[in-house]
A protein has these predicted regions:
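Gly/Ser/Thr-rich loops at beta-strand to alpha-helix junctions
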Residues: 15-22, 45-46, 73-83, 101-103, ...
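Long, charge-dense
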Residues: 82-134
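N-terminal basic/disordered segments at the start of proteins
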Residues: 1-32
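C-terminal, charge/polar-rich interaction regions
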Residues: 162-208
Length: 208
């Protein structure tokens, strides 16, 4: 269903993790959120989460004079509450949850998955698409495959939390599980809390 925004004139700046760029762009197009301006930070920051909050703070400070409405498309993302401390100071809200797996799957479903098997490694569409760049190469598993058991010895399964029904990504996720010697499970989530979180922010500007 397309969300009509003809009555909305006030732009909203969404500062997002680069890992969500494709999904947010798709949601913007499908819902007609033409007043939503997207600015992405490097997805690689997830490998250095201690840098995320400061980078967010800089972007908010730089753009808050131009935009009266700013929303952050991050969860906590391993920052130990640092993002929330920045956002509380600036009066800005973010997506719900501790991480993207949480808001894609939904808190209740993710809790069930985590409780069923604590030793679970999760992939999203983005991570399935960029598995080599964000998992294999940073851990140097391409150079030293024997390190696999060191990093993943306590894991039992890989769960692919897909946003789209894409056979190529499904095959890539299966291959990732094989590379890590983990059982494979596919759970289709769609856009989950990413969509509902952005929708709620849009509705604030329409009086809905």
């Amino acid at each position: 269903m397309r969300w009509h925004t003809e009555q909305v004139s006030e732009p909203i700046l969404v500062i997002a993790c680069g890992a969500l760029a494709r999904e947010i762009t798709e949601l913007k197009q499908s819902h007609g959120w033409d007043h939503m301006h997207l600015m992405c930070m490097d997805a690689w920051l997830h490998n250095e989460p201690e840098l995320i909050a400061d980078r967010l703070h800089r972007k908010i400070t730089r753009h808050k004079k131009k935009y009266s409405r700013i929303f952050v498309a991050y969860a906590d993302c391993g920052t130990g509450g640092a993002i929330d401390r920045v956002l509380e100071k600036e009066g800005v809200e973010r997506l719900p949850g501790a991480h993207c797996y949480d808001f894609f799957a939904g808190a209740q479903r993710f809790a069930v998955l985590a409780d069923a098997e604590p030793g679970t490694f999760y992939l999203t569409d983005f991570l399935a698409r960029h598995f080599e760049r964000f998992v294999i190469k940073p851990l140097r598993l391409d150079e030293q495959p024997h390190l696999r058991d060191h990093y993943f010895g306590n894991y039992r399964r890989l769960v692919f939390l897909s946003q789209t029904m894409n056979e190529e990504l499904l095959a890539a996720a299966r291959d990732a599980a094989k590379q890590l010697a983990l059982d494979f499970e596919h759970v289709h989530c769609g856009y989950g809390g990413l969509e509902s979180g952005l929708m709620a922010e849009v509705e604030k500007g329409t009086g809905g």
